[in-house]
Regions:
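Membrane-interface transmembrane-helix boundary segments in multi-pass integral membrane proteins
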Residues: 61-62, 127-147, 279-299
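Membrane-interfacial loop-to-helix junctions in multi-pass inner-membrane proteins
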Residues: 1-16, 93-106, 233-242
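Membrane-proximal extracellular juxtamembrane segment immediately upstream
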Residues: 249-293, 297
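Aromatic-rich transmembrane-lumenal/periplasmic boundary elements in polytopic membrane proteins
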Residues: 23-28, 108-177
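Residue-level detector of conserved catalytic or cofactor/ligand-binding positions
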Residues: 310-316
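Hydrophobic alpha-helical transmembrane segments
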Residues: 70-80, 207-224, 297-305
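Transmembrane-helix bundle segments that line or gate the permeation/cavity pathway
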Residues: 1, 15-40, 72-76
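Individual transmembrane alpha-helix segments
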Residues: 58-69, 158-213, 291
Length: 317
């Protein structure tokens, strides 16, 4: 919009709507993992307490993680756009404008990457106490023990439970679980096999963390270059700009991998401890129609968003 106030006021309902959407999605997902606020009597849900269900035990930890990673991703997408513009434009006026945008985006991105890492650490500690089977699946951790290793990537033999080709960091899983290398971390062998999530969740965890670490390193280097005067010339070097260009898709992938992780990590439950996914499958009519309409709606949103972005990017600034 040419008028900055029009742009500002139109953004307000988007911010409010997006925030409420994030709140309710996170609340529902938290409820599915740590259900609360109801009783089961004669196969029926009774004595429902909506607020207790909404603000269940995992809500705050998950909400912090969602907010931090969303802000991080937003910042890195904007930084990637600014970096792309700087790689294309050589005019002094354009470079000044996009450099300011890049500085602000990278600072916000770095701060929220740190918050995301703190939120991730709190999530690991929460899983250790409340969903130890999920944490064990993330790390292919089968035997209960202290000084448990953090396993990165590798290949698991699900019959023998042997892991090959992995990078193992001694004791780090125990430390992440409760700030001590002596912490005992429960292994998968302590849980019923038919209640364990698919072991592929390990890769989603590793990919999510890898993307996050990459964004942290790039934004950390940028902050260093920005603070130290002798290194400031590297802030808009081509190598740095290309690296920043990658933080946009990397941060988006981190969020996607994170959602795959939390949703697949909840399996086989749709409501943990109460209802399996297989029990929740519906045979109601009209599902095909509803699914098709949703698909068409999102296709329309994709096209209109792409056209809007193309239109916005046409002016020089």
């Amino acid at each position: 919009f040419k008028n900055k106030w029009t742009h500002f006021f139109i953004s307000i309902p988007v911010i409010i709507g997006g925030s409420f959407s994030a709140f309710f999605i996170t609340s529902v997902n938290s409820f599915m993992n740590t259900p609360a606020g109801f009783e089961i009597k004669n196969g029926r849900m009774v004595n429902v307490q909506p607020l207790e269900a909404m603000f269940n035990s995992s809500f705050m930890v998950r909400a912090l993680h969602v907010v931090a990673t969303a802000c991080m991703t937003m910042a890195f997408i904007l930084a990637a756009i600014a970096a792309f513009k700087l790689l294309r434009h050589n005019h002094t006026e354009d470079r000044t404008y996009h450099t300011k945008a890049l500085n602000l985006s990278m600072i916000v991105g770095f701060i929220n990457t740190v918050f995301s890492m703190i939120a991730g650490d709190l999530s690991a500690k929460f899983l250790h106490k409340v969903q130890p089977d999920k944490l064990a699946a993330y790390e292919w951790h089968y035997d209960t023990q202290s000084h448990a290793n953090l396993v990165l990537f590798g290949v698991l033999n699900e019959k023998t439970h042997e892991v090959s080709g992995a990078l193992e960091i001694p004791g780090l899983l125990s430390f992440l679980a409760d700030n001590s290398f002596d912490t005992k971390v429960k292994g998968l062998n302590e849980f019923p096999k038919n209640e364990l999530p698919p072991m592929i969740v390990h890769y989603f965890f590793d990919l999510m963390v890898s993307m996050g670490i990459f964004c942290f390193i790039i934004s950390g280097l940028y902050m260093l270059f920005l603070i130290v005067k002798k290194l400031r010339k590297y802030v808009t070097s081509n190598l740095m700009l290309y690296a920043i260009l990658l933080t946009g898709p990397a941060s988006m992938l981190a969020i996607e991998f994170g959602w795959f992780l939390t949703e697949m990590g909840r399996q086989p439950w749709i409501i943990r401890g109460y209802m399996r996914v297989s029990e929740a499958a519906t045979q109601a009519g009209g599902i095909t129609l509803v699914t098709t309409l949703f698909g068409l709606l999102y296709l329309l949103l994709l096209v209109t968003s792409a056209l809007s972005l193309i239109h916005i990017s046409e002016p020089t600034r």
